């Protein structure tokens, strides 16, 4: 019996040792394998936040000046581009350019007349805004035709679209500025002069032109931009100082990108909404703002982008320059590429409408 117990104990010990041997092999430290790189959990669609910037913008007190930039602000498009706007009101384009030259503002809006200063090198166009129809030549009670302007006192604002429409109107009937008594006045003073009868006629843009037509008894619209649409064009643009366009390119591309989105929204039949924003900013009644919606052909950002690609936009500025030369406001031809930043508009448009944006 003792021998049997000893044999059984020996067998148990053998199996126990075997089990320990298996356990040792299972827990042995394996040869280190090549380290796998950690999986990248970063969202490929996430972009580095844009550095916040504040842009000082000069505008005029009308729907046309504000329709796109105010929409871009109200709809959050400027915020998307990291931009905070500081808006300042000015009487006209030349005054806005002077403010830019002094450093008071970064970007400004101009009507047709002030484009001659861009062609002269004083400013560079960073975006086409729209094709205007807000300028008009208006006669008082005793002036009912363009021919009646001869010998009359006519108020206008020199260096602005007011001067352009007046020159076109006079030339269309064989007259020049020498055939009238031309009175260079501030736009608000022109309205007052028409109301008091101190001048016989005037050349103005909206909304002042609408005010004269509504409040001056016997007033007659003698001509507007559409009168000469087959031979001329009236453009409105956004501008900046040439040296800054080169040195601070990113700021202007970001601004134009947001502006194009504002144009897309506004031009898509959102006139009532835009008019409310304009009325609130200018502290005018809604109807006054809404009535200005017919002052232009409102271009979308996509239309401007496509127009640059096919040469249409360059053609607009070339025609405008031809009119400057023929009217004596520009001495000689200047390549439009010298003062229109097509590349800024193209880069902004590429991000919104180009192949990369479609992917």
Region annotations inferred by a language model:
Residues 1-9:
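Positively charged n-region of N-terminal signal peptides that target proteins for export
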Residues 9, 13-17:
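Hydrophobic core
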Residues 18-30:
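Bacterial lipoprotein signal-peptidase II cleavage site
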Residues 29-186, 193, 200-206, 221-222, ...:
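Short, glycine-/small- and polar/acidic-enriched structural segments
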Residues 105-107, 196, 200, 296-313, ...:
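Short amphipathic alpha-helical segments at helix boundaries and their inter-helical linkers
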Residues 106, 112-113, 183, 189-282:
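Pocket-lining segment of extracytoplasmic ligand-binding domains
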Residues 246-331:
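Secondary-structure end/capping motifs
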Residues 317-359:
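Conserved C-terminal helix/tail region of periplasmic/extracytoplasmic solute-binding proteins
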């Amino acid at each position: 019996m003792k021998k049997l117990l000893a044999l059984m104990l020996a067998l148990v010990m053998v199996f126990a040792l075997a089990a320990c041997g298996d356990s040792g092999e299972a827990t042995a430290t394996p040869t280190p394998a090549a380290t796998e790189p950690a999986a990248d959990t970063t969202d490929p669609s996430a972009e580095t936040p844009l550095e916040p910037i504040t842009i000082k913008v000069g505008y005029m007190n009308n729907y046309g000046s504000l329709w796109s930039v105010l929409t871009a602000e109200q709809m959050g498009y400027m915020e998307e581009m990291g931009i905070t706007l500081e808006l300042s009101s000015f009487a006209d384009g030349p005054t806005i350019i002077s403010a830019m030259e002094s450093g008071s503002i970064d970007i400004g809006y101009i009507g047709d007349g002030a484009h001659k200063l861009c062609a002269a090198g004083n400013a560079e166009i960073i975006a086409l805004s729209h094709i205007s129809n807000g300028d008009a030549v208006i006669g008082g009670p005793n002036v009912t035709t363009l021919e009646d302007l001869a010998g009359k006192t006519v108020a206008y604002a020199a260096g602005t679209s007011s001067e352009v429409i007046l020159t076109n109107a006079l030339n269309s009937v064989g007259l020049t500025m020498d055939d009238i008594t031309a009175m260079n006045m501030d736009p608000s003073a022109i309205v007052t002069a028409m109301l008091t009868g101190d001048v016989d006629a005037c050349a103005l843009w909206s909304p002042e032109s609408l005010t004269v037509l509504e409040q001056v008894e016997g007033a007659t619209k003698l001509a507007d931009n559409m009168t000469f649409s087959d031979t001329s064009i009236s453009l409105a643009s956004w501008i900046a100082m040439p040296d800054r366009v080169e040195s601070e390119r990113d700021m202007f591309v970001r601004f134009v990108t947001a502006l194009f989105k504002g144009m897309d929204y506004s031009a898509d039949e959102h006139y009532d909404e835009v008019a409310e924003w304009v009325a609130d900013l200018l502290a005018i009644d809604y109807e006054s703002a809404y009535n200005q919606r017919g002052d232009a052909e409102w271009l979308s950002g996509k239309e401007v982008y496509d127009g640059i690609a096919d040469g249409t936009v360059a053609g607009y500025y070339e025609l405008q320059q031809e009119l400057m030369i023929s009217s004596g406001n520009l001495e000689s031809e200047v390549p439009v590429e010298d003062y229109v930043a097509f590349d800024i508009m193209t880069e902004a448009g590429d991000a919104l409408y180009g192949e990369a944006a479609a992917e």
